[in-house]
A protein has these predicted regions:
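Single conserved hydrophobic/aromatic residue that forms the stacking wall/gate
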Residues: 1-8, 12-13
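Conserved segment of the thioredoxin-like fold in thiol-based oxidoreductases
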Residues: 109-163
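Thiol/disulfide oxidoreductase modules built on the thioredoxin-like
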Residues: 138-142, 149-193
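A short beta-strand-turn-helix
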Residues: 65-88, 157
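Hydrophobic beta-strand anchors of alpha/beta hydrolase catalytic cores
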Residues: 89-90, 121, 166
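Conserved redox-active cysteine motifs that mediate thiol-disulfide chemistry
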Residues: 92-109
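Long amphipathic alpha-helical scaffold segments
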Residues: 25-60, 64-66
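Aromatic-flanked redox-active Cys/Sec active sites in thiol-based oxidoreductases
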Residues: 86, 91-97, 126
Length: 195
């Protein structure tokens, strides 16, 4: 594949990172110059690809802390919830994301269905302004823990480029499933809790 320009090459690599698996991305990357690999868009794609590779089902969760991530502005870590003896469904979302907001009623139903069981939901707001997140939280009335102002930290660590991104963690913090949407969320939670 001939890539005539730096910009064109960056776009090809970035687009490929969204549409192929991690091994195919690595193979495509091996065919480009070091100059292209060092460009900011390609470095971002490499970060996301590495995060995806490191966080497949069976991998232990990677912690992060958001300094003002609680609604009251205090620090909060993913490990405050994940790896503490409960199944945890983590929903990465943003106030401006229509599919994210559209999925909230289904997550509310799951939360209600499994209340009192060994199950928790945590929402993590990414790529969003604090005020917009707080307004959406007021509108949506999600009764589970919230981490806000996370920006790109989770997407870089967990290797995702689109939201909603829903990941189910086991009680010890191992990833059970990721990239969950719609009925797949219900099925993954039900299967995990039946064990």
């Amino acid at each position: 594949e001939i890539m005539p320009s730096l910009v064109g090459s960056e776009m090809c690599i970035r687009d490929r990172s969204y549409t192929v698996g991690t091994d195919e991305f690595d193979e495509a990357l091996s065919n480009v110059s070091s100059r292209i690999k060092k460009s900011a868009p390609v470095q971002k794609s490499i970060t996301v690809n590495n995060g995806m590779k490191a966080n497949q089902p069976g991998s232990r969760f990677i912690d992060f802390t958001i300094e003002n991530g609680n609604i009251d502005g205090t620090p909060v870590s993913l490990s405050d919830y994940v790896g503490n003896g409960k199944y945890v469904l983590v929903d990465f979302w943003a106030s401006w994301c229509a599919p994210c907001r559209g999925g909230i009623p289904g997550i509310k139903e799951l939360y209600k269905k499994y209340a009192g069981e060994n199950f928790e939901v945590v929402s993590v707001a990414v790529w969003d302004e604090r005020a917009a997140t707080l307004k959406a939280l007021e509108e949506e009335q999600m009764p589970w823990p919230q981490i806000i102002d996370a920006q790109e930290i989770p997407s870089n660590i967990y290797g995702f480029t689109g939201i909603p991104q829903v990941i189910l963690f086991s009680p010890d913090g191992t990833i059970i499933a990721r990239d969950l949407h719609g009925k797949a969320i219900d099925e993954a939670v039900e299967k995990a809790l039946k064990k």
